[in-house]
Regions:
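N-terminal helical cap/lid subdomain that shapes the substrate entry/recognition surface
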Residues: 3-102
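Asp-based, Mg2+/Mn2+-dependent phosphohydrolase catalytic module
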Residues: 1-9, 22, 36, 81, ...
Length: 220
């Protein structure tokens, strides 16, 4: 995976190092008693996430709006205070279910043993993501942590990848970025001059012809 010219590796967090699906399903079960609406939730998440990436809405307001729209689609119109209450319940359940993928720490530590510098680049609210990194013992694994909610820039914008490279003291061409989203992670990193690696844990994806990125199915 790591060629000789690589001096640093950056990682996405959710669905790359942290099992996003498991914790998100736990949040749905808190709200509905079941996670049968997982597919619907994913579609709604992608729709709202686009607005966040476009700078149309902040991360935490986006989460509340998603919850409001989710229940509206199910015929339940929530007042703002009830939206907040349910989103807080959901978030608490998600936090209780945070866990790393089994290959996350072995990968990070193997790269560290090779002398590589490491960074996390994640699109999320700062407080939420730092709490997650602390709870899972990830903070100490990274030389730099870049969170969109703290910086005002998000993947796939080139600026956040290049800022990570500066923090690590490397040129973009000396860095690799690994993430589960083809567009936001792998292609975004490529466009910023890094080596983009798409982590497709499901094995169901396909790299577009001539994309100039790599694809892996697991971290270690």
């Amino acid at each position: 995976l790591v060629s000789p010219e690589i001096a640093a590796v950056c990682f996405d967090v959710d669905a790359t190092l942290v099992d996003y699906e498991a914790s998100t399903r736990a949040g749905l079960r808190e709200l509905l008693g079941t996670d049968d609406a997982w597919a619907e939730w994913c579609v709604l998440t992608d729709q709202h996430y686009e607005g966040y990436l476009a700078g149309q809405i902040g991360f935490e307001p986006m989460l509340r709006q998603r919850t409001k729209d989710f229940f509206a689609r199910r015929g339940e119109l929530l007042c703002e205070s009830e939206v907040v209450r349910r989103e807080e319940r959901r978030t608490a359940a998600v936090r209780r279910a945070w866990r790393l993928f089994d290959d996350a720490l072995p990968c990070l530590r193997a790269l560290r043993n090779l002398g590589l510098r490491l960074a996390a680049i994640t699109n999320a609210a700062g407080e939420l993501q730092r709490a997650k990194l602390d709870a899972l013992g990830l903070h100490a694994e990274f030389d730099a942590v870049l969170i969109s909610g703290e910086l005002g820039i998000a993947k796939p914008h080139r600026a956040i990848f290049r800022r990570a490279c500066r923090a690590l003291g490397v040129r973009p061409g000396q860095a690799m970025h690994v993430g589960d989203r083809l567009d936001t992670d792998a292609l975004g990193a490529r466009d910023a001059g890094l080596h983009g690696v798409w982590l497709d844990r499901s094995g169901s994806g396909m790299i577009p012809q001539g994309a100039g990125i790599s694809m892996i199915g697991q971290l270690a």
